[in-house]
């Protein structure tokens, strides 16, 4: 009744493989948040050491001054190995430079980040998908690794790069020029 047609299955397999490669070799940010476009990629270097390349994916109408009112994706492509615990602790330090929060919030957020952020190697990517009033979803190499559903955390965490008090003003300025 049904005849197997090897060429049909072979061509279907090729199509599936092509889709898989396209999704996994390219940036997943447009798929994570439809309608976003990348701003120019920026490199963060500290004391001459390259840390990561940062890319901000935004929708038309995005305003840096009111970044917490817009959905967007922040993508960090690491250029060196770092421990997840170091990323988490440094994030808390940087968040303090952007805004105030209590010791309880710090403890809760640090615990959440320690649970979420993995150790990274050169070539790994961390993405933060932000949706206003909801919080932040984190991905590691395009796989969801956790969520922190606290709008204040999201505002301060993403403010590390986007707030006017950022300690990486060159990244922010370059993205402002790209808007």
Label each region the model flagged:
Residues 7-8, 21, 31:
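Generic low-complexity segments that are intrinsically disordered, proline-rich and/or Lys/Arg-biased
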Residues 2-14:
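Bacterial N-terminal signal peptides that target proteins for export
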Residues 12-24:
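Bacterial N-terminal signal peptides
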């Amino acid at each position: 009744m049904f005849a197997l047609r090897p060429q049909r299955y072979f061509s279907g397999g090729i199509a599936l493989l092509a889709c898989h490669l396209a999704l996994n070799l390219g940036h997943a940010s447009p798929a994570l948040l439809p309608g976003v476009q990348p701003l120019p990629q920026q490199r963060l270097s500290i004391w001459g050491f390259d840390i990561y390349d940062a890319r901000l994916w935004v929708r038309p109408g995005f305003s840096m001054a009111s970044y917490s009112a817009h959905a967007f994706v922040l993508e960090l492509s690491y250029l060196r190995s770092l421990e997840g615990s170091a990323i988490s602790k440094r994030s808390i330090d940087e968040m303090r430079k952007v805004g105030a929060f209590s010791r309880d919030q710090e403890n809760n957020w640090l615990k959440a980040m320690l649970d979420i952020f993995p150790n990274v190697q050169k070539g790994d990517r961390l993405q933060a998908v932000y949706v206003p009033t909801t919080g932040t979803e984190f991905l590691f190499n395009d796989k969801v690794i956790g969520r922190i559903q606290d709008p204040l955390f999201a505002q301060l965490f993403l403010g590390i790069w986007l707030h006017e008090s950022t300690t990486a003003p060159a990244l922010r300025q370059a993205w402002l020029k790209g808007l």
